[in-house]
Amino acid sequence: MSNFLPFSRPAMGAEELAAVKEVLESGWITTGPKNLALEDAFIQLTGNQYAIAVSSATAGMHITLMALEIGPGDEVITPSMTWVSTLNMISLLGATPVMVDVDRDTLMVTPEIVEAAITPRTKAIIPVHYAGAPADTNALYAIAERHGIAVIEDAAHAVGTYYKGQHVGARGTAIFSFHAIKNITCAEGGLVVTDDESLARQLRTLKFHGLGVDAYDRQTWGRAPQAEVLTPGYKYNLTDINAAIALTQLHKLEQLNARRHDIATQYQHALVNLPFQPLALPAWPHIHSWHLFIIRVDEQRCGINRDTLMEALKEKGIGTGLHFRAAHTQKYYRQHFPDLSLPNTEWNSERICSLPLFPDMTNADAERVITALHQLAGQ
């Protein structure tokens, strides 16, 4: 269908092509100066002391958990309303993911829910800044400090998200994603920010074979030939081709997110006259990056269920997404946690639908979605 409106499309242009061309012509296409520039730019954005670029947010989560020495016998608290990679990384390290419920209307963990899940085995909390809105990090950090456990902010949705005047992640350790549908993208990539010098050093070692230097050394303009393996590590470094694209996108972040905000506002105004329920906005001061615009499709209220709506929109040439099916309902986790019940998560998991939202959308594109929702409501 030539006029199909996808759920998401990356906003790429001449600047990204020029950035890639520059790297290709430089003769250094793997981890190099563009990685350093990207890390420095993120430090400027978030205010953290350290930034470590990696091949994906999942890779960043893996080595952050490893650096915190999380393993067998440990518990990590995470919402089930998240992408399964977080649960997978916890499980692969031999630790136990403690999946908790979320607020029914923001789909984020609350301090009360998190504190109730803490046990003597708890080593970390992973709150998710969901859909571009910030979790209540001050309250969560207060709980973590009281119990002596780590906080790892899942900021995959949150480049450009601010909480009480600070960019998310500014207070501690956070992981960002540059996946193809994210607010800034380089197809695949991620980045960890932190103020912990020891953690940053371990992440740089773990992301590149356990070597004592990064893939690209600032002083030697290349890999130090005397580099030694300090610990077994991984191949999680980001190429400069990807880093150059991400850096170019980061320079355009304000305008990219402003366009997302405009489309989201158009949706919000339209939903006043429709039965579909958007997510509630957090009560605390914040700037939303509008990674996703999610509606809840309750059949009793809307006259149509979520799956039928998504299929009907597809037939009208409109793509949608599902973020996310609750992790504890996936086969592996269902088998390992058969008695787990998370009512708010489950209610939303059966009803959430992500509408098209990306910077290159026009107002007419958004109006097309709104018109289709009007046509389908009550069917």
UniProtKB/Swiss-Prot annotation:
Pfam families for this protein: DegT_DnrJ_EryC1
Modified residues (N6-(pyridoxal phosphate)lysine): K182
EC numbers, comma separated: 2.6.1.87
Keyword set, alphabetical order: Aminotransferase, Antibiotic resistance, Lipid A biosynthesis, Lipid biosynthesis, Lipid metabolism, Lipopolysaccharide biosynthesis, Pyridoxal phosphate, Transferase
Gene3D superfamilies: Aspartate Aminotransferase, domain 1, Type I PLP-dependent aspartate aminotransferase-like (Major domain)
Family membership: Belongs to the DegT/DnrJ/EryC1 family. ArnB subfamily.
Function: Catalyzes the conversion of UDP-4-keto-arabinose (UDP-Ara4O) to UDP-4-amino-4-deoxy-L-arabinose (UDP-L-Ara4N). The modified arabinose is attached to lipid A and is required for resistance to polymyxin and cationic antimicrobial peptides.
Protein name: UDP-4-amino-4-deoxy-L-arabinose--oxoglutarate aminotransferase
Species per Swiss-Prot/TrEMBL record: Escherichia fergusonii (strain ATCC 35469 / DSM 13698 / CCUG 18766 / IAM 14443 / JCM 21226 / LMG 7866 / NBRC 102419 / NCTC 12128 / CDC 0568-73)
